[in-house]
Amino acid sequence: MIGFDSIGTMGRLGNQMFQHAAVKGIARKHGYEYAIPPKDPNTQIDNYGLLDAFEMKGVDHIKYCYNVVPAQERFFHYDEELMNICPDNVNVAGFFQSEKYFEHIEDEIRKDYTFKNNWLQPSLDFMDQFGGEEVLFLHVRRGDPNLTDKRGFKWAYVCLLYTSPSPRDS
């Protein structure tokens, strides 16, 4: 079994989604079982939200993987070696921000990331007011740019906005 005990300490929900998808993708590639940790405010210093936001019905185990060898992602991009020769009985760590870790199980990941009804229903109710019209939602990151000095890198404040023709205009 491979695990990712540090989910919830290395980034917020978006990072956690990549991390879970990667550990599941690596496990499925090699035929291993995998685990993600339970919600534990004593050890998770960040905002661990996977189990609160999503159904996560396809998770093999929700538990810690104690007494296993650590396996660290070596780069901030796809680590092909880790993907291809990851041994069993390891506890992976990293950000895993590439779909290459899980593209072979995309349908499973999409099912895992079905929103729980307490998040989904208010959103659907909100959308009803638009009567089926196309709607665009925009998320603006506001917190991370303020952490520049702590993280050691600069943010690019460039926003590219373009419009594409509506299918109705064709």
Residue ranges and their predicted role:
Residues 1-39:
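N-terminal pre-catalytic "stem/leader" segment of glycosyltransferase-like enzymes
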Residues 27-28, 127-128, 164:
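N-terminal cationic-hydrophobic initiation segments that often serve targeting/anchoring roles
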Residues 39-161:
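Secretory-pathway luminal glycosyltransferase catalytic domains
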Residues 162-169:
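Conserved small/polar residues in nucleotide/adenosyl-binding loops
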Residues 21, 25, 61, 71-72, ...:
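Generic detector of well-ordered secondary structure
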